[in-house]
Design a protein with these regions (language model features):
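GGW-centered surface loops in extracellular recognition modules
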Residues: 1-60, 163
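Residue-level detector of beta-strand face positions
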Residues: 51, 180-182, 203
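Glycine-centered tight beta-turn/hairpin loop motif at sheet-sheet or coil-to-beta transitions
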Residues: 54-56, 185-187, 207-210
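Extracellular-facing segments of soluble proteins and assemblies that are Gly/Ser/Thr-biased and enriched
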Residues: 55-91
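Basic/aromatic-rich interaction segments and small domains that mediate binding to polyanionic partners
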Residues: 191-217
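Intrinsically disordered, low-complexity, charged/polar segments
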Residues: 210-250
Length: 250
């Protein structure tokens, strides 16, 4: 079962958008300048982005915008990406690197369309195509093969599926005993109340929404007595105070 987190919002020209939105307005011409796209803090609304916890990063559960070209995304610096602050934590936001990253994510949590919403839609890849006019994207029919589209084409079935990776270590010193926390790493998610903030570990009172993969117990988080969880600080790929409005969606 995939662990999911709903946090962060996407805005176009200062208006919040709901994934998956149309980047090119109906009245735009194909080569109009792209709109301004921003990733901002969570709004605690259904418009916040849903992410899948997989391979020590977050990958959007669906493309967040469609009818956008690879050239648009380059101009917006959304291919290789940049650092962005979401709810006080800094991440690197970028496009999927290559087909291997996509296939490894599917292998880790399953190919279920209810998780990834990959049927009938494609996601751009950074992976070079070997053709200056065309770029690669995932294929909505054959998962193990990339498809190729024109660099400047805006197509409804092709979109931007962002990836979030931790850019700066969480400031554990700011955490306070008694706080409700949500932290994740590899394929696992821990939801709980902070009991101890040690030198190397966090000890949390487990709450609903916690799901620890057996493969992650030796590296990220392990169950303890009295329904507690010990989290290895060095393996945390993201951590948030629940007061920020972040929702876990197991």
């Amino acid at each position: 079962m995939a662990n999911r987190i709903q946090m962060g919002s996407i805005w176009m020209d200062c208006s919040i958008q709901s994934p998956c939105f149309r980047f090119e307005p109906e009245e735009h011409f194909p080569f109009d300048s792209p709109a301004n796209i921003e990733i901002r803090d969570s709004t605690s609304s259904p418009s916040d982005i849903i992410w899948v916890v997989v391979n020590n990063k977050l990958i959007a559960a669906r493309p967040v915008m469609h009818t956008v070209s690879f050239a648009d995304l380059q101009e917006l610096n959304l291919v290789h990406g940049y650092e962005v602050s979401i709810d006080g934590q800094w991440y690197q936001i970028r496009m999927l690197m290559d087909l291997d990253e996509w296939l490894l994510a599917l292998e880790a949590v399953g190919e279920d369309d209810h998780i990834w919403h990959w049927e009938q839609c494609q996601s751009f890849l950074q992976q070079p195509s070997g053709n200056g006019l065309r770029v690669l994207c995932t294929d909505s029919r054959r998962l193990d093969q990339p498809d190729m589209v024109m660099r400047t084409d805006r197509r409804q079935q092709t979109g931007w599926r962002p990836v979030l990776e931790l850019a700066r270590k969480p400031d554990f010193q700011k955490l306070e005993v008694g706080q409700k926390l949500l932290c994740w790493g590899w394929q696992s998610l821990v939801n709980g109340i902070l009991l101890e903030n040690g030198t190397y570990d966090l000890v949390l009172q487990r709450q609903d929404g916690t799901d620890i993969s057996p493969k992650d117990t030796a590296t990220f988080a392990s169950p303890a007595m009295d329904d507690q969880v010990i989290v290895n600080k060095s393996a945390v790929a993201g951590l948030r105070r629940k007061s920020n409005g972040i929702k876990s969606r197991g």
